[in-house]
């Protein structure tokens, strides 16, 4: 009986992995070559901040030895490379140009489609299109990438660069949900669509695999992994996700009032967050300014510290 019990507790035999072909050398060379222009984008963003700091230092602190450029060039660089809308527009334009031939399906790892997808994701990372400063603009970023976004959608996660995403009206996607819609399995790249239905809710840090479809008013618990279809009005949880009952529905039937003033306020704060590196540069530049000469003490009648009048 003891031997039988121990045998029952033994872990199941794992399936042996198939032989995985390595990434072709030409793809590796291409990735290294594309890294140079990608990193250059980050350098251009910092050059914009440095140019603004040089102009300010030369004008405010009389640091004439600093090289300066026209403020128009600084404004253009800030608009395209630093402001959240500019970064999102450039990223979306580049991603749509790169991923135009990409459709749902299976592709070889290291092939042309994989390289295009890798390049589009690295472009988004280098541009910082989906960082904290752009949280307010996430719905517009998803539309720019080609996603089908319904009305009054609450999107708090990064949309896929492929644009193969459908968000139904009034659905809610919480923070850090994996919506990429693609993954590598050995030497095969799986690319699929992700669909979220009307008023469905996706919990934080969940994953929707390629081809996942969440029905209307369904609920996915936080930390779940969804493979396949979730029927309407059901609650699923776990990894992989399984049916856990009926969806609870919203706490209140009346939706909160949508106030555009808060959207504007959040967008303004996003712009301020994007300016924090520039403020750090200005703080460092202030340390190079000439020392401040305090005025003479009034008690001395404008005289020096020893009571004698200052030299002419």
Name each model-derived stretch.
Residues 142-144, 148-243:
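Structural signal for interior beta-strand "rungs" in well-ordered beta-sheet cores
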């Amino acid at each position: 009986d003891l031997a039988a019990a121990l045998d029952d507790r033994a872990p199941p035999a794992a399936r042996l992995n198939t032989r995985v072909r390595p990434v072709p050398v030409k793809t590796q060379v291409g990735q290294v070559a594309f890294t140079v222009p990608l990193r250059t984008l980050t350098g251009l963003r910092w050059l914009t901040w440095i140019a603004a700091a040089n102009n300010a230092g030369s004008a405010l602190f009389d640091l004439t030895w600093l090289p300066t450029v026209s403020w128009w060039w600084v404004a253009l660089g800030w608009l395209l490379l630093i402001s959240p809308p500019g970064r999102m527009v450039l990223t979306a334009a580049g991603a749509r140009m790169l991923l135009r031939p990409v459709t749902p399906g299976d592709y070889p790892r290291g092939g042309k489609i994989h390289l295009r997808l890798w390049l589009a994701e690295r472009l988004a990372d280098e541009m910082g299109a989906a960082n904290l400063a752009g949280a307010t603009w996430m719905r517009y970023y998803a539309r720019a990438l080609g996603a089908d976004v319904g009305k009054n959608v609450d999107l708090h996660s990064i949309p896929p660069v492929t644009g193969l995403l459908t968000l139904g009206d009034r659905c809610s996607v919480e923070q850090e949900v994996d919506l990429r819609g693609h993954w590598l399995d050995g030497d095969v790249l799986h690319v699929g669509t992700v669909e979220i239905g009307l008023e469905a809710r996706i919990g934080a840090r969940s994953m929707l695999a390629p081809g996942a479809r969440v029905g209307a008013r369904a609920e996915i618990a936080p930390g779940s992994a969804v493979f396949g279809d979730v029927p309407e009005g059901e609650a699923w949880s776990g990894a992989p996700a399984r049916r856990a009952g009926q969806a609870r529905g919203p706490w209140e039937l009346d939706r909160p009032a949508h106030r555009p003033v808060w959207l504007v306020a959040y967008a303004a704060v996003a712009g301020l967050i994007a300016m924090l590196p520039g403020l750090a540069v200005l703080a460092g530049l202030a340390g190079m300014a000439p020392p401040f000469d305090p005025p003479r003490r009034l008690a001395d009648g404008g005289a020096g510290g020893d009571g004698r009048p200052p030299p002419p």
